[in-house]
Design a protein with these regions (language model features):
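Hydrophobic alpha-helical transmembrane segments of ABC transporter permease domains
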Residues: 2-3, 66, 74-78, 84, ...
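An intracellular "coupling" helix at the cytosolic face of ABC transporter transmembrane type-1 domains
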Residues: 55-59, 147-148, 164-173, 177, ...
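Short intracellular "coupling" helices and adjacent cytoplasmic loop segments at the cytosolic face
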Residues: 55, 93, 128, 136-160, ...
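Helix-loop-helix
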Residues: 92-94, 100, 193-207, 277-356, ...
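ABC-type nucleotide-binding domain
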Residues: 363, 370-371, 377-628
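Transmembrane helix-loop-helix hairpins at lipid-water interfaces of multipass membrane proteins
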Residues: 1-40, 61-115, 122, 196-200, ...
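Juxtamembrane helix-loop junctions of ABC transporter transmembrane domains
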Residues: 26-43, 66-67, 74-87, 108-155, ...
Length: 628
């Protein structure tokens, strides 16, 4: 060790270059398909948008930055202090000097721990606020999408975006950014400190870095693939659960529990296998780095011990026992952030991929947007007119073809026809759930495309066959928009639509619990609650889509009575399953394959012996046969 070993010098140079390459390589963006889907957004663009959410909390991040500097100072200074204490102990020293050194070390340690704690608390609070803001924006954007756009996105995928992907982004703010920066500066700071302390021992440590670089390249390749599999399998199982738990009653009715269980088992095993692969990759990488760490320690003890025993100097630097202790601590602090750096940059790329998936949802432009000159409607008389309206869900496959009709204020108009004739589509277009391709739809003489969507829908009350009730109480499901409505007014509406018949029998009345989707109530009871919800908000136009289908006779009588009362509220549009429920309608429009075949009153259509007559006769004979 009297002269510098050339091989040691070469190894040190290669090691230094490897450190820089390690940091640079970890920063390289993944390929477009690296995270399992076609990436089109640059990392810089993703970070810019994410930092837009972090901007309101810039002051807190500045504070965290100073706390990180304090932590880095401890990582660099503590080995020097311990090394100094070691030299005091082995030499002639006074207890006062030892006490001072120990006190300084303890003070630095306590200060560092306090800084780390405050840093974690601030980051967690800020990170959760940022993710809360992002989730709210994402949820609000999903609410703005049209029915057609929502039909194209599986619910399970949306749930994954709002939960799993935002959690990955949360890790970026609460952990990754700060620790990545900290680890990079710790590595460089320790490298400078070791060079300042002893060149030769530093070059020895750097000889091991090329191996770490090699392991990192291999690790990143396999860990990225493993993470992609876990992420894809998680999305797949979330989508499967969302669909099958919602339809579990159908599964039970048809006795398909075993088949569905087998499908779920396969997806669960796929996720388990992917997770095991991810664990294996991390389980191999860490021991390899640890092996290099142990090897460097052994070399330190050998070279350092030989240099210390032989009292060797190199470029004026001597190797004392304090130097060996200091290097021992530095090597530990040097290898740990290198190992973490490789893993954290991999998680960063995964978080960026999750961010892109979230932003890909937020970048979907809503099909239904207000025109720049859209107007608010203070009131609606209920005059509705279709003028040569054409509409298709799929380009070229027309669902409505040149439909024209006029509904006068306070009229009751019914739409009948076979499945797929366009009845429900007409009602959806009136509420602007979809955008029609040709023609005009007028409300009180105003094109609905020139009316603000929120204003338009505020004047409509929709009662569908498949009534959706939210988890909560009967009261919360009836009032929906306005929580300050008194119980007296709610019960008045319930009596009006005959919903009080079953509400009064419940133990908690309006405070009775409503479980998910209202599954603890019958179809008829859910329908009556839907009527109450609609009437309470005083709509000018009421829309009933198969509202009396699939209910028992007793409840149907209550609903029929409710419908008769509601006819006086305003304009009523009905899609009827049972023709007996629309005999008193002011106008009945008969549809077939998206075209109007005939229209008129019940008696006029029967006298015409057209399509309505055929439908009514078939249904009448069926009802007679059912009675027999």
């Amino acid at each position: 060790m009297m002269s510098l070993n050339p091989l040691l010098l070469v190894g040190g140079v290669i090691g230094t270059v490897s450190v820089l390459l390690l940091i640079a390589y970890a920063c390289v963006k993944d390929k477009k398909t690296a995270m399992g889907f076609e990436r089109s957004m640059a990392d810089g663009e993703i970070l810019r948008r994410l930092f837009g959410y972090a901007k309101p909390y810039l002051r807190q991040f500045v504070v965290v930055g100073f706390l990180v500097l304090f932590s880095i100072s401890y990582d660099i200074a503590s080995p020097l202090i311990v090394g100094y204490i070691e030299e005091l102990v082995v030499g002639d020293f006074e207890l006062k000097s030892l006490y001072v050194s120990v006190a300084v070390y303890a003070g630095v340690l306590v200060f560092s721990m306090a800084s780390t704690y405050l840093q974690a608390v601030i980051l967690q609070r800020v990170g959760q606020r940022i993710i809360s803001d992002l989730r709210e924006d994402l949820f609000t954007h999903i609410e703005s999408l049209s029915h057609g756009q929502l039909n194209d996105i599986p619910v399970g995928k949306l749930v994954t975006r709002v939960t799993n992907d935002t959690n990955a982004i949360s890790m970026m703010f609460t952990n990754l950014f700060v620790n990545l920066t900290k680890n990079a500066f710790v590595i460089l700071g320790i490298l400078v400190a070791m060079l300042f302390l002893n060149y030769e021992l530093t070059l020895m440590v750097l000889c091991f870095v090329p191996f770490i670089l090699l392991f990192t390249v291999i690790f990143r390749k396999f860990s990225r693939r493993a993470y992609r599999k876990v992420k894809d399998a998680t999305t797949e199982i979330n989508t499967y659960l969302s669909e099958n738990l919602s339809g579990i009653k159908v599964t039970q009715i048809f006795g398909r529990e075993d088949e569905k269980m087998e499908e779920f088992r396969q997806k669960s095993q796929t996720l388990a296998k992917a997770t095991q692969e991810q664990i294996f990759v991390f389980g191999v990488f860490r021991p390899l780095v640890y092996m290099l760490y142990i090897s460097s320690i052994l070399c330190l003890f050998y070279l350092g011990g030989m240099g210390h025993l032989n009292h060797v100097t190199f470029l004026g630097q001597t190797i004392s026992s304090g130097t060996i202790v200091t290097f021992y601590m530095y090597i530990s602090k040097f290898f740990t952030p290198i190992q973490n750096l490789a893993e954290q940059f991999n998680w960063l790329q995964s978080a960026l991929a999750s961010s892109e998936k979230v932003f890909s949802i937020m970048d979907i432009q809503p099909q239904m947007v207000d025109a720049p000159d859209a107007v608010e409607l203070d009131e609606v008389k209920g005059d509705i007119e279709f003028r040569d309206v054409w509409f298709s869900y799929i380009p070229g496959e027309w669902v409505l073809q040149g439909v024209s009709f006029h509904v006068e204020p306070r009229q009751t108009v019914a739409f009948v026809g076979s499945t797929g004739s366009g009845k429900s589509t007409i009602l959806s277009l009136i509420c602007r759930n979809y955008e029609f391709q040709k023609g005009e739809i007028l409300i009180d003489g105003i094109d609905i495309r020139k009316i603000k969507i929120s204003s338009l829908r505020r004047h409509f009350g929709q009662m569908l066959q498949d009534v959706f009730l939210f988890s909560g109480t009967i009261r919360s499901n009836i009032v929906l928009r306005e929580e300050n409505i008194p119980d007296e007014e709610i019960m008045k509406v319930c009596r009006y639509v005959n919903a009080d018949h079953f509400i009064n029998k419940l133990e908690h009345g309006l405070d009775e619990e409503v479980r998910e989707r209202g599954n603890n109530f019958s179809a008829g009871q859910r329908q009556l609650l839907s009527f109450a919800r609609t009437i309470l908000h005083k709509p000018s136009v009421m829309i009933l889509d198969e509202a009396t289908a699939n209910i028992d006779t007793e409840t149907e009588l209550l609903i029929q009575d409710s419908l008769e009362k509601m006819r006086s509220v305003g304009t009523m549009l009905i899609v009827a399953h049972r023709l007996s429920t629309i005999q008193h309608a002011d106008n009945i429009i008969v549809l077939s394959r998206g075209k109007i075949l005939e229209q008129g009153t019940h008696q006029q259509l029967l006298a015409a012996h057209g399509r309505y007559y055929q439908l009514y006769t078939l249904q009448y004979h069926k009802e007679q046969m059912d009675k027999q």
